[in-house]
Amino acid sequence: MESLNALIQGLGLMHLGAGQAIMLLVSLLLLWLAIAKKFEPLLLLPIGFGGLLSNIPEAGLALTALESLLAHRDPAQLAVIAAKLHCAPDVHAIKAALALALPSVQGQMESLAVDMGYSAGVLAIFYKVAIGSGIAPLVIFMGVGAMTDFGPLLANPRTLLLGAAAQFGIFATVLGALTLNYFGIISFTLPQAAAIGIIGGADGPTAIYLSGKLAPELLGAIAVAAYSYMALVPLIQPPIMKALTTDKERKIRMVQLRTVSKREKILFPAVLLLLVALLLPDAAPLLGMFCFGNLMRESGVVERLSDTVQNALINIVTIFLGLSVGAKLVADKFLQPQTLGILVLGVIAFCVGTAAGVLMAKLMNVFSRHKINPLIGSAGVSAVPMAARVSNKVGLEADGQNFLLMHAMGPNVAGVIGSAIAAGVMLKYVLAM
């Protein structure tokens, strides 16, 4: 009878908390969105499955060695950790002390937990290697660079301004997060506000990279918000685009793009990297990988490498990136008031970025002889190529013969560059404070 009772008590179901149950449902929702609705399935499917694995009771797949020790709640072991941190031998007190401790001290406590016989779960290891090191988003950016054609941007350099204007959503959201904190509605630190703001760039890898550096505790919510809203671009953007433009403006036909030479395409990534990195070194990792991937594509001499980066490598890294993000979908980190704030601020960021791009195009038309269709301004958010397709679709609704796709790809690509630069600005000034 005792053995039967022990068997029942050992069932994971007996240890399932309300928070874990909610997160399992959230993870199933992400899987449904990925499979049934095809919302960014390449990321939401592994993120959702990672969330399932992270919330299995007693499995500890997303826990570090130290977190496993704290979950085990052995009084003698807690006393050893507490003595090192000079706090009470209580789980909550130890967690509070760890939150304030230097990274070196946190590393020492992790090593101490390993010495006591604990080990990190597989998802925690994935997270440390893929996101903790920053390597996975950078490799993704290399792949994106290899798939990007700078031709439309080089053919119409003015569209760079549209990509820059759309980044206003990032900085507006940072101010929004700090405003919520100022009025005591939801608590956000400056690094957290900066990490949330990058959602407005509509660039998943950049959002994950910056969150991993500035606010890893919010990474799960930020990544889910970023990719969910990227999938919802066809629903979010058109009402804003139509509200800010007249029917006449939506029918503007732009001049045919010129042919961009091979030399221009080869020189551009190198020149872009040097110009930006010499002024803003913190943007060099993201922009460097992006430009390197593009140079492999345009040079024409490393087709095997370019093909590998565009396909096999980016697909492999995407799997581990998604599972690593899923490791952060644990109840005690995701089910917080901050998550609601992130979801609200995220959609505001998209709306502000879209509006800023459209309004910049209208402003440019005041001073320009060759008119720009304001609809392509919304493509300044770097959801490539979805935002450009939305611009083209809304344009065709106004004029069935007005094809804007290639024109919209200019600001769309510029948005990728802009989000990387914005991330560099955040890193430089937030980490320096």
UniProtKB/Swiss-Prot annotation:
Q: Name one GO molecular function term.
A: decarboxylation-driven active transmembrane transporter activity
Q: What reactions does this protein catalyze?
A: oxaloacetate + 2 Na(+)(in) + H(+) = pyruvate + 2 Na(+)(out) + CO2
Q: How does it assemble?
A: Heterotrimer of an alpha, a beta and a gamma subunit.
Localization, UniProt: Cell membrane
Report the GO terms under cellular component.
plasma membrane
Its needed co-factors are:
Na(+)
State the protein's name. Answer: Oxaloacetate decarboxylase beta chain
Instruction: Give UniProt keywords alphabetically.
Output: Cell membrane, Ion transport, Membrane, Sodium, Sodium transport, Translocase, Transmembrane, Transmembrane helix, Transport
Explain the post-translational modification. The N-terminus is blocked.
> Which residues fall in a coiled-coil region?
none
Organism for this UniProt entry: Klebsiella pneumoniae
Superkingdom in the source lineage:
Bacteria
